[in-house]
């Protein structure tokens, strides 16, 4: 029984270790690089009407009312 117990413990340890390595690999693969994040941020800021100064005066007033009423 001692050899079987040792084998089971070793097998479970190896499986857990492999799952941890796989999870770390998947996490690393899904995280975008800093260059990608900068590109996404710049494109978002350029396309968003709040940041590219294309709001009409009425939209600015409405935004101001929204912010001041929420405080």
Curated annotation (Swiss-Prot):
Keywords: Late protein, Membrane, Transmembrane, Transmembrane helix, Virion
Sequence ranges on the Virion surface membrane side: 22-70
Origin superkingdom: Viruses
Signal peptide: none
Pfam families: Chordopox_A13L
InterPro entries: Chordopox_A13L
Keyword presence, Transmembrane: yes
GO terms for cellular component: membrane; virion membrane
Subcellular location: Virion membrane
Membrane-topology descriptor: Single-pass membrane protein
TM helices/strands, residue ranges: 1-21
Upregulation: Expressed in the late phase of the viral replicative cycle.
Chain's role: Essential for the encapsidation of DNA into immature virions (IV) and the subsequent maturation of IV into mature virions (MV).
Family: Belongs to the chordopoxvirinae A13 family.
Record protein name field: Virion membrane protein A13 homolog
Organism for this UniProt entry: Fowlpox virus (strain NVSL) (FPV)
């Amino acid at each position: 029984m001692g050899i079987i117990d040792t084998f089971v413990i070793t097998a479970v340890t190896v499986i857990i270790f492999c799952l941890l390595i796989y999870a770390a690999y998947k996490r690393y693969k899904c995280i975008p690089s800093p260059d990608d994040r900068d590109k996404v941020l710049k494109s978002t800021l350029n396309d968003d009407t709040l940041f590219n100064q294309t709001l009409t005066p009425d939209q600015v007033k409405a935004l101001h009312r929204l912010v001041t009423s929420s405080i």
